[in-house]
């Protein structure tokens, strides 16, 4: 889970350029030819910022070509552990059922952040309890 993804030599050059120039978005001319020109997704090949929230984690977090998944100050993409932390998984969470790095990336990238899931469930239960109480009051008034 803490193993660093192995970037291509070209992606190492791209990441080094971002660090050397202290920028977060790769200039258009340094992108692969197929991604140059008018594009709306400038965070591809982007670098995370310590002082800003991370973008949505997807199963592609191991490659900087999939989004803004470059470590803020290292020449590498996020590790699975770092991506899991961004998603809100506690460090003690057991990812051992994932037999491959790809399965691990899919599990982390497709997950609903645990804190968000807990908030949604709590809100649903509170709303459900209020609805039940309203139904009981309505039934007692109609009797």
Where in this protein do the model-derived segments appear?
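C-terminal target-recognition/interaction regions appended to catalytic cores
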Residues: 1-143
